[in-house]
Amino acid sequence: LKTVLILGAAGQISSYLVSELLKETDFKLKLFARNATKRINVTDPSRETVIDGDFNDTQTLTIAMKDVDAVYLNEMRDLPSVKKIVSAMDDNGVKQFIGATVLGIEDEVKGAFGNWNTSMIESSITRRKKTAAVIKDSDLDYTILRLAWLFNDDKNTAYEITDSGQPFGGTEVSRQAVAKLITAILKDETGKYARQSLGVNEPNTNFDKPSFY
């Protein structure tokens, strides 16, 4: 039985992911966040464990990793945190890591949309290039998800993925679609997602900027 630790479990993608995993799998879930007990609404206490913690609190992080098979990190923004997470995984022998980050960290967003994207989030991209490098230099079976601009739509779970070295595929993707992809990665037993950095977008959204801007 697989146990998944969700770091940043109060985040929007995380909350969609939890409901998807409860519905589509029998995995046990550890939900780690600041003030988690106040912010997270547990629907299945037999499968969900809530952990109040901070990524920089090495002790709580290490305890949370016990008996975990996979880790999902909802936000790859903070370099010291990402380093601590990798160390805690190594200390506990946890191999599978999935991390959500922004598009543009591999200079893969081309054309007018690429220029717009850089003008909007250049400092975010610069910061997240560093966290991605830490993950890629680790010995983890990582899947880095470079996400298009996000929106919410329960009825729209369409996504497509591009590999490292391919131009990014579109401007936007729903958080629900991202949760569906993460669930597919966690359920996969072939290893095809290991040590991959994937661009994620909704098909047929190749615009100059997201449709909601």
Where would I find each of the regions flagged by the language model?
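Residues at the starts of beta-strands that form the adenosine-phosphate
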Residues: T3, F27-K30, K95-Q96, D141
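Short, well-ordered secondary-structure micro-motifs
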Residues: N41-T43, I63, V109-G111, K155-T157, ...
